[in-house]
Curated annotation (Swiss-Prot):
Keywords assigned: Chaperone, Cytoplasm, Nickel insertion
Keyword Transmembrane included in the entry's annotation: no
GO MF assignments: nickel cation binding
Protein name: Urease accessory protein UreD
One Pfam family named in its UniProt record: UreD
Stored InterPro entries: UreD (IPR002669)
Annotated compartments: Cytoplasm
Protein function: Required for maturation of urease via the functional incorporation of the urease nickel metallocenter.
Gene Ontology CC: one annotated term: cytoplasm
Length: 307
């Protein structure tokens, strides 16, 4: 008997045609979802009119064979941030046996269409892959040259508090960002990772650290390289006081940051600082901590986070 989930979530974001405050154009949404994915109450009361979208995985965890698909169409001039309601769990793969040693994979596919002058931020909470869990995510982004896209990935491999490691589990990730130019669609950024086996132990991999995180920001084309170079220096300075190994580098039109260590909190704090700096660079309002995130460690108020 099969019991896999095949959940979908379709989101359309667009600016409102009317507003009580003519100085603020709010982003509103249309949503359709199937279990186990569910769009919770959406807020668009931010100072800049940004839409805040929480997505819930109502089953409480992912198992082998689950297939999740998220489609986002951000229309012209829309601005939004999307996150998961809670940390997500990937349980050990079902169906492992001598006849089927590979087990069953869980998969999540995300397709983002970001149109002209839009700003979309994809910032799910951490993913916890249990021992033996098999999880693959594929993210494809079509980004207009005038638009901005920021995404964060944060994964814990094994239940560290229970002294559990990933074991025979695997975490895979593929991020492909495309942009249009005079010659048609081209790769803006491509990033593929697999964390398993020797990569968990090697000094060129995680070096026995259980937490991995990445932040990618692809800027509007109008952002100057000089501004990005200055941003890179500031991002590196913001590592002060945090635990773990953090690197940050320039892309052709953006930045890429990596975290490896033992603390998801340190990773969140550093990514929050970088996120804040990207807003400052574009002269936008400072990030507001989402209602669904852990309030006991709000980095906008924590003494360890100066921003």
């Amino acid at each position: 008997m099969k019991s896999q989930w095949h959940g979908t979530c379709d989101l359309r974001l667009f600016k409102s045609s009317s507003s009580n405050n003519k100085d603020i154009v709010k982003t509103i949404h249309q949503a359709k979802s199937t279990a186990p994915l569910k769009v919770m109450r959406v807020f668009n009361d931010k100072k800049d009119g940004r839409c805040e979208i929480p997505i819930l995985h109502s089953a409480g965890g992912i198992v082998g064979g689950d297939q999740l698909t998220i489609n986002v169409n951000a229309e012209e001039d829309s601005i939004a941030i999307c996150s998961s309601v809670a940390a997500q769990k990937v349980y050990g793969s079902r169906g492992r046996s001598k006849l089927n040693p590979q087990g069953s994979w869980a998969n999540q596919k995300c397709f983002f269409q970001i149109k002209q002058n839009s700003d979309f931020e994809w910032m799910p909470q951490e993913l916890i892959v249990y021992q033996g869990g098999l999880f693959e995510q594929n993210m494809t982004v079509n980004l207009d040259p005038s638009s901005s896209f920021l995404c964060v990935d944060l994964v814990r491999l094994g239940r560290t508090a229970a002294e559990e490691q990933l074991g025979s589990g695997v975490w895979r990730s593929s991020l492909e960002i495309f942009r249009d130019n005079n010659q048609g669609k081209h790769y803006e950024f491509s990033d593929r990772l697999e964390l398993s086996g020797e990569a968990l132990k090697s000094i060129h991999g995680l070096e026995q650290k259980p937490v991995f995180g990445s932040l990618t920001w692809i800027t509007p084309k109008k952002i100057m390289q000089k501004d990005l170079s200055d941003l890179l220096v500031e991002c590196r300075q913001q590592r002060a006081g945090l635990e773990g190994f953090m690197t940050c580098s320039l892309l052709e039109n953006g930045i890429s940051a990596r975290y490896t260590g033992s603390s998801t909190q340190s990773a969140r704090f550093w990514f929050y600082r970088i996120w804040s700096l990207t807003r400052v660079l574009r002269k936008l309002s400072m990030p507001e901590y989402m209602r669904i995130w852990p309030m006991q460690e709000n980095p906008s108020r924590d003494i360890k986070c100066p921003l």
